[in-house]
Design a protein with these regions (language model features):
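Conserved small/polar residues in nucleotide/adenosyl-binding loops
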Residues: 168-169
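Amphipathic alpha-helical scaffolding segments comprising HEAT/armadillo-like alpha-solenoid repeats
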Residues: 18-28, 50-61, 85-96, 119-130, ...
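Non-membrane alpha-helical segments in proteins
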Residues: 8, 12, 35-48, 61-62, ...
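Residue-level detector of extended alpha-helical repeat arrays and alpha-solenoid scaffolds
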Residues: 38, 72-73, 106, 140
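N-terminal alpha-helical scaffold/docking segments in eukaryotic complex subunits
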Residues: 1-26
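A mid-sequence, solvent-exposed acidic-amphipathic segment
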Residues: 103-132
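Hydrophobic, well-structured mid-protein blocks that either form specific transmembrane helices
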Residues: 55-101, 105
Length: 169
């Protein structure tokens, strides 16, 4: 069910909810009926002030509820600050999602890798791309998207990866 609330309006509302003392009640409500409610919960998880351990707990509870690319991708974008505060901890945290058989769990893991397209992680990202195998459309498109971002930031390394591979994702 979709209400039709635009993303910029949801972001404004998410910032307001994240500032409230009772934001946890909103995030922990799992009986959402509308796309926008789920999207809003993901945004609040990314925006609310909390320790990294608590945020990862909320992420773990939220990820299984992701059922479309938009919620996944916006949620991952909202986690940018969390990644900056605990880059290696979050790196370890997302590893199990990268081998999940579930389409949107693996997409979550791959889209989270976008935060790691840097000198320190580029080789690991391309190695992961090399072993990636999943039949689901949205997982495959996330991997193709990640490789395109790698190519923009590290064209030589990414081209070396792409040349010997018949990449069809």
């Amino acid at each position: 069910n979709i209400l039709g609330v635009r993303i910029p309006q949801l972001r404004i509302l998410a910032k307001e909810i994240a500032k409230r003392d009772n934001w946890r009640m909103f995030v922990e409500a799992t009986d959402t009926k509308f796309y926008e409610e789920t999207m809003l919960q993901g945004m609040v998880i990314g925006l609310a002030k909390m320790e990294l351990d608590e945020r990862m707990k909320h992420i773990s509870m939220f990820v299984p509820r992701i059922d479309n690319w938009a919620v996944c991708d916006i949620f991952c974008g909202e986690l940018k600050t969390a990644v900056k505060k605990g880059k290696e901890t979050v790196w370890q945290f997302i590893q199990p999602y990268l081998i999940s058989p579930k389409e949107f769990e693996i997409r979550f893991g791959i889209v989270m890798l976008f935060h790691y397209v840097d000198e320190e992680h580029i080789d690991a990202l391309l190695a992961h791309a090399d072993t990636f195998s999943h039949d689901a459309y949205y997982a495959r498109m996330a991997m193709a998207w990640m490789i395109s971002i790698c190519f923009i930031k590290f064209p030589e390394k990414t081209m070396k990866y792409l040349k010997p591979v018949s990449y069809t994702h």
